[in-house]
């Protein structure tokens, strides 16, 4: 995660303006990982023998509702205005919204945790607090 781009970067302006809110019912899953943990996981993978695909994601995915509250708390902004689906569908197209914003991604880092990798950031709230208040 970085505020300079990607999923968080695209969301920052509305949240900073106090217009951030959960998408639809907020029940879809969001998998995330801090940049520090991503780099550490890649280094760990280079030093350890692991076979098969590896998911580099934090061990605790969150719902969009929790994600939204965590960003709002980190920025000290309200998150009471939900984003009605017609708005992003009009702006970005239905296919993009359905695939990128609404698809549930409850991905777990099974190979990393089974192999003994230790995450530094396991909960979204403190990770976003540190990231967005730097």
Features from the language model and the residues they span:
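Short glycine-/small-residue-rich flexible loop motifs, especially phosphate/cofactor-binding loops
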Residues: 12, 69, 109-111
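Alpha-helical membrane-targeting segments
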Residues: 10-32, 73-104
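Residue-level signal for the nucleotide or nucleotide-sugar donor/cofactor binding architecture
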Residues: 2, 30-33, 62, 107, ...
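Mid/C-terminal beta-alpha module of Rossmann-like enzyme folds, strongest
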Residues: 41-42, 48-95, 129-134
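Flexible, glycine-rich beta-alpha linker
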Residues: 1-10
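Alpha-helical substrate-binding/gating segment
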Residues: 9-20, 28-62
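C-terminal amphipathic/interface module of NAD(P)-dependent oxidoreductases
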Residues: 99-134
């Amino acid at each position: 995660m970085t505020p300079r781009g990607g999923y968080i970067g695209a969301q920052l302006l509305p949240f900073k303006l106090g217009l951030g809110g959960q998408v639809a019912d907020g029940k879809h899953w969001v998998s995330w990982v801090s940049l520090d943990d991503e780099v550490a996981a890649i280094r760990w993978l280079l030093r350890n023998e692991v076979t098969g695909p590896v998911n580099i994601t934090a061990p605790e995915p969150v719902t969009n509702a929790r994600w939204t509250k965590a960003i709002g708390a980190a920025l000290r902004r309200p998150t009471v205005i939900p984003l009605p689906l017609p708005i992003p569908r009009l702006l970005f197209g239905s296919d993009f919204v359905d695939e990128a914003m609404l698809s549930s991604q409850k991905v777990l880092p099974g190979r990393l945790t089974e192999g003994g990798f230790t995450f530094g950031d396991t909960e979204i709230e403190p990770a976003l607090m540190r990231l967005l208040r730097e």
